[in-house]
Swiss-Prot record:
SUPFAM superfamilies on file: 6-phosphogluconate dehydrogenase C-terminal domain-like, NAD(P)-binding Rossmann-fold domains
Family: Belongs to the 3-hydroxyacyl-CoA dehydrogenase family. L-carnitine dehydrogenase subfamily.
Protein name in UniProt: L-carnitine dehydrogenase
Assembly information from the UniProt record: Homodimer.
């Protein structure tokens, strides 16, 4: 079966932080968007979120014809997906809810329309267990803010057709994203597994009084974080090996992996640890509001993305 990859109408189910990010990205790429969310006040909240991020999208560059007015909010799942060319679900992370929702989505959608789920913690074989035509169903796990960050992890389940994965990658690329095909179904996929390891270590360091939350964030943003925006861990360590590269690095520093530097198991989330983390991040926020911090983040990301894009082009890097 061939799947639709030329998208004119994008269906978004769930309009929270992630869902609204998908809506904003699709609108910015000149698509008609049909959205559904059963929560009271969801439409007003969605339109407000889209309006808040539109300035950043304008700065990044809108596709001709892009408009917030191309968003339509509907009352039922069936109306949302019936005429859609691509469907993205971003409902809460509860398996029972997603099973019921995808049963309804797949029954109402055309059989050659791809269905993506934004889930970060559930496996596609489980999410799509009750779906009709599960061969067209994938996980498309994005990163916040979805309307700016390009990474989307694409994961197939036991019934997903290889052609559906390639078709989904093509669709996500058309939305200006950088799809990463996760080859096996594993909990947390790729990026969140890496982030979870860092998060656990950070909590241990706070819990043991080694560092404050601000000091840990400084260790990241003034060190590895600057490199991570343009060069990942493996290339960074390749450079650390000098002219001999990664093999020399592994030979020289490989034994250090046996040193007990890291805790790995998650710390117990005691009231004290939670309080320490909350107090620390409150101090970091200072006088700034969450919305103000979001605007700061967006401006930084736009600047970093543009700088990396320009520098990559100059050096012929992918």
């Amino acid at each position: 079966m061939s799947f639709i990859t030329e998208i004119k109408t994008f269906a978004a189910l769930g309009s929270g932080v992630i869902g609204s990010g998908w809506v904003s990205r699709a609108l910015a790429h000149g698509l008609d968007v049909v959205a559904w969310d059963p929560a009271p006040g969801a439409e007003a909240a969605l339109r407000n979120r889209v309006a808040k991020c539109w300035g950043a999208l304008e700065q990044q560059g809108l596709v001709p014809g892009a408009s917030q007015n191309r968003l339509r909010f509907v009352a039922t799942v069936e109306e949302c997906v019936r005429d859609a060319d691509f469907i993205q679900e971003s409902a809460p992370e509860r398996l029972e809810l997603k099973l019921d929702l995808h049963s309804r989505i797949s029954a109402a959608a055309r059989s050659n329309v791809l269905i993506g789920s934004s889930t970060s913690g559930l496996l596609p074989s489980d999410v799509y267990e009750s779906s009709a035509h599960p061969e067209r169903c994938v996980v498309g796990h994005p990163f916040n803010p979805v309307y700016l960050l390009p990474l989307v992890e694409v994961v197939g389940g036991k019934n997903t057709a290889p052609a559906a994965i390639q078709a989904a990658i093509k669709v996500y690329e058309s939305l200006g994203m950088r799809p990463l095909h996760v080859r096996k179904e594993v909990p947390g996929f790729i990026a969140d597994r890496l982030l979870e390891a860092l998060w656990r270590e950070a909590l241990h360091l706070v819990n043991d009084g080694v560092a404050t939350t601000g000091e840990i964030d400084d260790a990241i943003r003034f060190g590895a974080g600057l490199r991570w925006s343009f060069m990942g861990t493996f290339l960074t360590y390749t450079l650390a090996g000098g002219e001999a590269g990664m093999r020399h690095f592994m030979t020289q520093f490989g034994p250090a992996l046996q040193l007990p530097w890291t805790y790995l198991p998650a710390p117990e989330l005691t009231d004290k640890l939670i309080d320490d983390v909350v107090d620390g991040t409150t101090d970091q926020l200072g006088k700034h509001s969450i919305s103000g911090l979001e605007r700061y983040r967006d401006d930084c990301l736009l600047a970093v993305l543009e700088a990396v894009k320009t520098t990559k082009a100059r050096h012929g890097m992918a």
